Each structure stands twice: as C-alpha cells, then as structure tokens.
Amino acid sequence: MTRSWRRTPAGPLLRCRVALVAAVSLGVVGVACAAPSALPPPLAGDYSHYSLPDGAEILPPTAVVPPLPPDPSSCGALSSLRPDPGLRPETAPPGSALAAIVARGRLIVGTDQNTNLFSFRDPSTGTLSGFDVDLAREIARDLFGDPDKVEFRLLTSAGRFDALERNDVDLVVHATSITCERATRVGFSSVYFEAFQRLLVPEGSGITSPADLAGKRVCTFIDTTSLATIQRVAPEATIVAVPDWDDCLTTLQLGQADAATTDNSILAGLAAQDPNLEIVGPNLELEPYGVVANKNNDALVRFVNGTLERMREDGTWNRLYDRWLGLLGPTAGPPAPSYRD
C-alpha cells in the first residue's frame, strides 16, 4: 500500500502561507520566509475568484490533450551513448560542440529557478541551488577543473528545447523526462534520476487517489507528460494547466485547484514550502530524467555520461541525493545506466 507523505517545517526552504487578505490582493502568495515555530494555518477565506497565473489554461474533461507517450524503453530512448574513457577536454573532436565549450572556457546550462530541491533561488543567498544545479556544476568540474565555470540561463519548461536548438545553451539540466518523441529531437544522457507521478493535496482534503478527482480541479503543467497521465487516470477531472511548476502551489493555496500532479520529486519541493500540503496516492507513471543536449552532439553526450559514471562511482550522486532529495526517503542509489555504442 502506498502511504501518503508530508513534510514538517524545517530549514530556509519552507515557504510560509500568507494569511492576510491584503497580501493576497497584492499577489503575494507563497512568499519565502524563515521557518515558523508552528505550522502556519491555511489561508482563511475564499480566493478562488482571483485570476489564474499568466498563461494558465482550463481544460475540461472533454478537452483533447496529447496522448500518453509510449514507454521510453520501447524505443531505446533510455539507452545513451557509452562514455569514452579517452575523451577529455583536450581531446575534444575539432568542430564539435564539446570543443567549442572548452574554447569558450565555461559551460552554459539552461534550468529554472522555481523547481524547489532541483533548481531554485535560495532566499538566504540569492543563488541558484538544488540537485540539478549541483549536477551541472559537476559537469563543469570535469570540463575545467572548476565547478564555478558554469553560466546558468533561466528557461521555462515549454521553452527549454527551443533554447537548446537556438544554441542559447549547451545543455538543459531541468528535471526533464526522457520520452520517445523527445529523443527524436534532442540527445539525452543516461538516466540520472527516476521520479514517479503522484498527487499533492491540502491535508484533510479527503483525496487519496485519482478516483477521488471526479468533478475536481487538478493543476499540472503545460507540455509535460503529467498532463496526459492525469487525464487518463482521472477522466472526469478538470485540468488547470499552468506554465510554471510553482504556479500549482499558488492555485492550491488560493483554492483554485483541489489537487496538483506531477513527479513526486517536484511535488516534494512544493510540499516543503507549505506544511499544510501532503503527497498522496499510488505511483502513476515512471519519469526518468536525463541531461539534454542538441541532437548529434555525440561527444558532449558521451562526456556528460562520463561525469555521471564518475558521480555514481565516487559517491557524489549519493551525497547530492542526501543533501537535496533525502526527504523522499532512503535511496537504492543512482539508476543503472543503459548504453549503446
């Protein structure tokens, strides 16, 4: 039986709920602040009439959404290029993306600042932090001997592949699920994390599974695999599709959605900001994450896979998991890689 999960308030990542109507009227929702000594109460009153986040769409049960993608193992998308032990920065193939990065002297990585635990703006320092941020820094460490030689550019989930194809960034490290369709457009590293889609609900809501979502509003994200999954398992729910993961926290706090759904790793980051929320229900869909490069940038993908191999072997992956994702529970270790030549 799958047990529900909830986060107790701790640390600077906790986001306070805003209890004052005046604050809500100014659009100040989910404001970052120091951890309180007791659980903050849920918002009092009805704020469901407030405008939805910019770019949000309401999709009724009859809406046609992209179909659930096939299992990525069925098309070989989970098999990435084998690391080359002889591939080093100084031996990068001339004219390759890897050689251009080495010549530039820094790595440019696309991510976002709204995915708590993976890539977020630390309110105490103002710097980008999280599992994905540290992963990018490890790639820079292997490229230049210096984890600080990385430039982060902020992207939305919807714009990450376009930014890559415009060569605005060298890599995308942004909690990106590997799918068959995406693998025809971009190159993926080996799997560096496996998440499972679940539900995030207000504590005491009575929602414990997708069967409880009939007639309810469920927040999820535009252009993600989560949208197709929730329509399949909760066909009578209305979907609130938003462009930014943090928008689901806002819609839940204002009563504009009854539940949110996406990867449990991302939901845990939202729940860490509001202790009145809990993760419930069964695992709905496996979501394997990969680092993303432009299609045919083979040397760069092999180099990234070499970094991931090193992180598995020297314990770096486990240290990053314990630092950022330990609230998900004990880990069996990093996913085993699958390679092709």
Task: Name each model-derived stretch.
Residues A34-S37:
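Bacterial signal peptide processing site
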Residues A175-T184, Q253-L286:
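A ligand-binding cleft/hinge motif common to bilobed small-molecule-binding domains
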Residues I108-T111, S129, P210-T224:
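Short loop->beta-strand "edge-of-pocket" segments that line small-molecule binding or catalytic clefts
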Residues T111-T115, L154-A158, N167-T179, E203, ...:
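Beta->alpha turn/N-cap motifs
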Residues Y47-V172:
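Extracytoplasmic small-molecule ligand-binding "clamshell" domains
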Residues F193-V201, A268-N305, L327-D341:
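Periplasmic-binding protein-like
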Residues R137, R141, D148-D212:
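Acidic, polar ligand-binding/catalytic clefts
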Residues P53-A92, T224, V291-G329:
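Extended ligand-binding regions for polar small-molecule ligands
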